[in-house]
C-alpha cells in the first residue's frame, strides 16, 4: 500500500550555509569527525532501534567526502540493510537524488511516506510506527509531531520538554504520482500548508543541542528524568552513561526552565494563532 522513507542530509555543500553558530567553518575534517560522533551516538542508535522496521533510511553525503570517512560511514550502516548511503554533488543535487531513488524504488506502490530527521537528532522507538498509523490513503497530508525533548550535551548536560510546530521531524504522506517528498521545502514552510495533521499526545523526538549547532539553542523546560525516557530514546551506551552521571539537576537551572517554558509556549501559541486566523499564506 505504501513505502516509507526516512531521509537525512549530512555534509552536503551549500553556498548559503558555511559556518556554525559560533562562526566556525563547516564541513571541515574536524566538523565531520564531530558530526559522525553525534550521528553514531544519538541518531543512528535511535533509528536502528525502531520497533517498526518497515522503512528505508536514505542518507545523503557529499561526493567529496574523504575516503576514510566513507569507510567509517559504510561500517556504521553495514548491519542495517534498509539503511542506504548516497554520495551526491551537494545540496543542489539533494532533492532530485531523493526523487530519482524513490521513483525507481516505489514503482507500482500507490502511496509513499517521507519523513525527515537531522543527522544529530534522535527519535522515539515508536516514531516510525506512529507516523504509519496516520496513513489513511491520503493524497497529500503532512504529519507534524508537536512535542519532544531538548537535550543539551555540551558544555553542560540538561534535559527538558520542548514543543515545536512546523519542526524538522515532519513527515508527508503522498499519492505516488510525481510525489514532491517532505524535502521539497524547508520544514518551517509547512506553516503555509492546510493539509496537515498535528500529533500532540506523545513526545516522539529529541533535539540534541551542542556547540556546533547551526542555529539551535537549548530551550528545554521542566524536570524530566533521563531514567524515565532512556528506554524510549535509544542512544549509545557511552552517552547513556555520560548523561546519567553528569546531567545537571533541574533545581540548578529552575529559572532558565521557567524562562524557556514561557518562551516555548508563547512561540507555539503565537504560531497556532497566526495559522488559525490566516496570517500564513494557505495553499
Which positions does each model-derived feature cover?
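C-terminal catalytic/acceptor-binding lobe
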Residues: 1, 7, 174-283
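Hydrophobic targeting segments
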Residues: 3-8, 46-47, 55-60
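Short loop/turn segments at strand-loop or loop-helix junctions that form parts
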Residues: 5-22, 62, 146
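Active-site-proximal specificity loops/subdomain of glycosyltransferases
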Residues: 19-30, 34, 61-113
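Short, acidic, metal-binding catalytic loop of nucleotide-sugar glycosyltransferases
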Residues: 24-27, 42-54, 79-80
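Conserved catalytic core of nucleotide-sugar-dependent glycosyltransferases
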Residues: 92-107, 122-200
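Short acidic donor-binding/metal-coordinating loop in glycosyltransferase active sites
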Residues: 119
